[in-house]
């Protein structure tokens, strides 16, 4: 649990730094479309960092459940947001890593789906 919270905290720091960097240093260097893409990456990172913090402090989930959900969320953040950062900060052609961003999105969807499944099990159990 603390490992996941530590990773979430680090990813939160990175999101703040890259958000500020994007707002101040990149605005004049990126096209409006590229800036929008970069801001989307930062926003998704923030949202999923908050979800990671929630999942790992929710007392009704087992450590195994927390770790499983966190695995997909952390992987999704790194692949989804990370690939967008690589494209815009390192000028790597999107064509060369086109598959990474959607793969990250799929991992995020799996993480959300696992969260949904865990809550659904609790609702069904409570209503039985």
What function would you assign to each model-found segment?
Residues 1-128:
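Polytopic transmembrane helical bundles with strong interfacial aromatic enrichment
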């Amino acid at each position: 649990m603390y490992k996941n919270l530590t990773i979430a905290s680090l990813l939160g720091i990175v999101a703040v730094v890259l958000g500020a960097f994007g707002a101040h240093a990149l605005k004049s260097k990126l096209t409006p479309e590229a800036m929008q893409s970069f801001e989307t990456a930062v926003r998704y990172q923030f949202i999923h960092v908050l979800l990671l913090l929630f999942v790992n402090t929710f007392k009704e989930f087992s450590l195994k459940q927390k770790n499983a959900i966190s695995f997909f969320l952390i992987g999704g953040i790194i692949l989804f947001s990370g690939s967008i950062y690589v494209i815009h900060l390192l000028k790597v052609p999107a064509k060369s890593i086109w598959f990474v961003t959607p793969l990250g999105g799929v991992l995020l969807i799996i993480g959300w789906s696992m969260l949904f499944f865990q809550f659904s099990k609790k609702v069904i159990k409570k209503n039985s």
